[in-house]
């Protein structure tokens, strides 16, 4: 077995083999080993991901995908227990931060053998059935503000203004966030290239404080994702955020509810979201709505 550095997006056959290996791991483990961005990075070299592959003959045994110091790593189901995970970790650059999606026992054991500790926890929370139907019946109207889809907003205010406001609001809402913060239009457009993107599933909260003849200000947005490939299909609160000047005014609830209504209209009986485990106010707010913790994803790293 060899550990090879490879530019996977430049070899589509190799990218497909890694995707198939990841799909088999997801079926076996019940959780995807690679997140959406790292899956996209297998084919899109604009993301600049590096890949370490454990190779034996023509077979890919395991994969480590790197974005700077952030790593997502997994071993194929049929080749676990052979030390491949350790070999991949040993080949990583110094001070990696390794995601363990689902924080499965094997990942925990590998991390502990390498003297790593959990430095970040990301929760998947879900709401379904009667709890979802009760939550989506809450009010969505806010005095002086209106909710419109991306399509409706572009028709009224123009694409340039809408997307500039979207980027500004996103960066104010997620100035602290390692993946979601610091976006520009190019990064936004990459996100909109996703096969699942639906402009009708992006909701904006607008403040037309200046009247009909001035451009409105975006107070918040709710970007939804419809998981049509799953059976049954379900919805996701992909990103929801408020602009800095609109926090603390009770606007998050109506904006979230509007998204839940949209997902129920599409036939969802379940909606999920991701939230940082240390964001206690948000976790408690989601629990009050009826969400509960369904999965946990962890980042492991060596302590300073």
UniProtKB/Swiss-Prot annotation:
Acetyl-CoA 2 binds at residues 240-242, 279-284. It is an enzyme of class 2 (transferase). Keywords: Acyltransferase, Repeat, Transferase. Residues 145-304 form the N-acetyltransferase domain. One of its GO terms (molecular function) is mycothiol synthase activity. GO terms for biological process: mycothiol biosynthetic process. InterPro entries: Acyl_CoA_acyltransferase (IPR016181), GNAT_dom (IPR000182), Mycothiol_AcTrfase (IPR017813). Pfam families: Acetyltransf_1 (PF00583). 1D-myo-inositol 2-(L-cysteinylamino)-2-deoxy-alpha-D-glucopyranoside binds at residues 36, 179, 225, 236, 274. Acetyl-CoA 1 binds at residues 73-75. SUPFAM superfamilies: Acyl-CoA N-acyltransferases (Nat). It catalyses: 1D-myo-inositol 2-(L-cysteinylamino)-2-deoxy-alpha-D-glucopyranoside + acetyl-CoA = mycothiol + CoA + H(+). Signal peptide: none annotated. The keyword Acyltransferase applies. Its EC number is 2.3.1.189. PROSITE patterns: GNAT (PS51186). The keyword Repeat applies. PANTHER family: L-2,4-DIAMINOBUTYRIC ACID ACETYLTRANSFERASE, N-ACETYLTRANSFERASE. HAMAP family: MshD (MF_01698). Catalyzes the transfer of acetyl from acetyl-CoA to desacetylmycothiol (Cys-GlcN-Ins) to form mycothiol. Monomer. This is Mycothiol acetyltransferase. The gene is mshD.
